[in-house]
From Swiss-Prot:
Role, per record: Produces ATP from ADP in the presence of a proton gradient across the membrane.
UniProt KW keywords: ATP synthesis, Cell membrane, CF(1), Hydrogen ion transport, Ion transport, Membrane, Transport
Family to which this protein belongs: Belongs to the ATPase epsilon chain family.
One GO MF term: ATP binding
Lineage top rank: taxon: Bacteria
Location of the protein in the cell: Cell membrane
Name under which the protein is recorded: ATP synthase epsilon chain
GO cellular component: plasma membrane; proton-transporting ATP synthase complex
Keyword Transport belongs to the record: yes
Length: 132
């Protein structure tokens, strides 16, 4: 079994993270998932969540990751998502306002895309939870 994973996190705007890690914990549509070195090959869909990264040095990092795709093969882990942010990049006030708007839309379902409003709520909650 290999000692480390090669992790790459990509968004349309940037290469968010690239490095050797011991562990990654995130949320897939099937539930919480922990990826360790030697993990079996897998492709899964990710939910908006706070993702925990344990670097080779043992340093723990947390980041907001939006819905996306995770692929693990040959100890190379790739996460592709629309948005990825470090805690210092998140505007708490903006996230709380987005949460409030999404909750209002869901309460008055007339003429809205419920799935889109629910995804917006999930993104806002994940950002808020990461900062608390």
């Amino acid at each position: 079994m290999a000692e480390v994973l090669k992790l790459t996190i990509l968004t349309p705007d940037r290469e968010f993270y690239k490095g050797e890690v011991l562990e990654v914990i995130t949320d897939s549509i099937q539930g919480n998932i922990t990826i360790l070195p030697g993990h079996m090959p897998l492709i899964t869909t990710l939910k908006s969540t706070d993702t925990r990264i344990v670097e080779k040095s043992g340093k723990e990092l947390k980041a907001f990751t939006s819905n996306g795709i995770l692929e693990i093969k040959n100890n190379e882990l790739k996460i592709l998502c629309d948005v990825c942010e470090w805690p210092g990049e998140i505007d708490l006030k903006r996230a709380e306002e987005a949460k409030k708007r999404a909750e209002q839309r869901l309460a008055h379902k007339d003429g809205i895309d419920v799935k889109r409003a629910q995804l917006a709520l999930n993104r806002a909650l994940a950002r808020i939870n990461l900062l608390k």
